[in-house]
């Protein structure tokens, strides 16, 4: 995962990972977005293919589950641009983080389930699966059980859970 090499650029990672024997990587989307400000998508895809490096997952998108109003619109617009990147680069899975800074009430939980379902529906249109990542430091969705419950309740076949061994 490029999360482990944040100080390096996307191009540096794209060269170093295969040199270290890695044939696949989880791309840090902010790195890819920054890289694409200077290098075309076509040239980037060619460089990845030449290096023998496949982008198998993308990290990560937040702000989708609980945001409302203009914030929700901004997060979903950003999400759709990232889905387009996933489609362009053949990245099959996008990691979504549960943005539960505070303990949610029943209305917020309902909104989170609906938002996850809507996000999964958008992702399906781009041929992308979503992987909901839970974190022990979150106020909610801090373990496998709550992540599985949210995914199950959203009812979308392309929504699943990310088991992140990094933290």
Model regions: which residues?
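N-terminal pre-domain/capping segments
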Residues: 1-91, 124, 156-160
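Active-site-proximal loop/turn and secondary-structure-junction residues that shape catalytic pockets
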Residues: 4, 29-33, 61-64, 98-102, ...
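Distinct, well-ordered alpha-helical segments
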Residues: 10-14, 37-41, 106-113, 138-156
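Acidic/histidine-rich catalytic cores of soluble enzymes
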Residues: 24-25, 55-58, 117-167
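Hydrophobic alpha-helical membrane-association signature
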Residues: 78, 112-115
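Active-site groove signature of glycoside hydrolases
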Residues: 86-106, 126-136
């Amino acid at each position: 995962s490029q999360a482990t090499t944040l100080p390096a650029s996307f191009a540096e990672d794209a060269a170093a990972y295969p040199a270290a024997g890695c044939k696949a990587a989880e791309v840090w989307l902010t790195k890819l977005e920054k890289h694409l400000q200077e290098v075309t998508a076509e040239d980037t895809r060619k460089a990845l293919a030449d290096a023998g490096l496949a982008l198998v997952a993308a990290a990560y998108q937040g702000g989708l589950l609980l945001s409302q109003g203009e914030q929700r619109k901004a997060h979903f617009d950003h999400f759709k641009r990232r889905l387009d990147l996933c489609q362009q680069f053949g990245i099959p899975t996008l990691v979504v983080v549960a943005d539960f800074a505070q303990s949610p009430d029943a209305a917020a939980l309902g909104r989170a389930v609906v938002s996850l379902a809507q996000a999964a529906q958008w992702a399906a249109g781009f041929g992308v699966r979503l992987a909901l990542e839970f974190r022990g430091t979150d106020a909610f969705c801090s373990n496998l059980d709550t992540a599985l419950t949210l995914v199950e309740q959203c009812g979308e076949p392309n929504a699943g859970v990310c088991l992140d061994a990094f933290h």
